[in-house]
């Protein structure tokens, strides 16, 4: 990647690398400050300290950080946790991910639901991983991303769940349920 800190601010590559390592250690390594936790089943999650749970946003952002910093082992552990505990494998939400779980992997809430930014960042980080690491390791990252896209774009609304992207407006639907989909309520929409 280009070092924009150097190009625009004159910060050396060595200074940039040192700062990135400090940030990585703060959030992924240091026992007192980290939000990245490994589980006994070769998975890992990102803990949301404000809500005391695990959210698709945090998981997918964590995966994006890992792929950007070339941390494949951590990336794979986060992806493994998300697939194992957050993915809906049956029912009308099949192919979507529960937007929040307990750190033990229990989905929270009575009714299944998702938050679209989680799926979007899962897809994006998996495509990035495909280009960085290839598709011959533990995961075919490209195939994983394509599967999510297929799953979240195959909902016709007949069971109350719609496509992640509104096919008319081309906008991301905040929650792909009828009320949000039909009102074109998107993730960046203002909240009253």
Where are the model-predicted features located?
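Low-complexity, Ser/Thr/Pro/Gly-enriched N-terminal "stalk/linker" regions
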Residues: 1-57, 68-109, 159-164
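Extended, hydrophobic/aromatic-rich amphipathic alpha-helical segments that build helical scaffolds
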Residues: 57-70, 119-129
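Extended ligand-binding groove/face enriched in aromatic
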Residues: 84-184
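Conserved small/polar residues in nucleotide/adenosyl-binding loops
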Residues: 185-190
């Amino acid at each position: 990647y280009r070092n924009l800190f150097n190009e625009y601010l004159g910060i050396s590559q060595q200074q940039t690398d040192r700062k990135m390592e400090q940030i990585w250690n703060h959030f992924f390594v240091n026992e007192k400050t980290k939000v990245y936790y490994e589980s006994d089943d070769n998975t890992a999650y990102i803990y949301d300290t404000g809500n005391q749970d695990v959210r698709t946003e945090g998981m997918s952002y964590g995966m994006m950080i890992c792929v950007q910093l070339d941390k494949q082992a951590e990336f794979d552990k986060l992806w493994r946790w998300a697939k194992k505990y957050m993915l809906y494998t049956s029912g009308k939400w099949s192919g979507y991910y529960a937007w929040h779980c307990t750190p033990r992997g229990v989905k929270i809430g009575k009714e299944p639901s998702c938050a679209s930014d989680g799926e979007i960042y899962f897809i994006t980080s998996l495509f990035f991983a495909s280009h960085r690491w290839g598709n011959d390791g533990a995961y075919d990252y490209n195939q994983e991303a394509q599967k999510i896209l297929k799953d979240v774009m195959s909902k016709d609304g007949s069971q109350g769940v719609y496509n992640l992207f509104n096919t008319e407006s081309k906008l991301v639907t905040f929650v792909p349920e009828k009320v949000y989909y039909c009102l074109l309520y998107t993730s960046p929409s203002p909240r009253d």
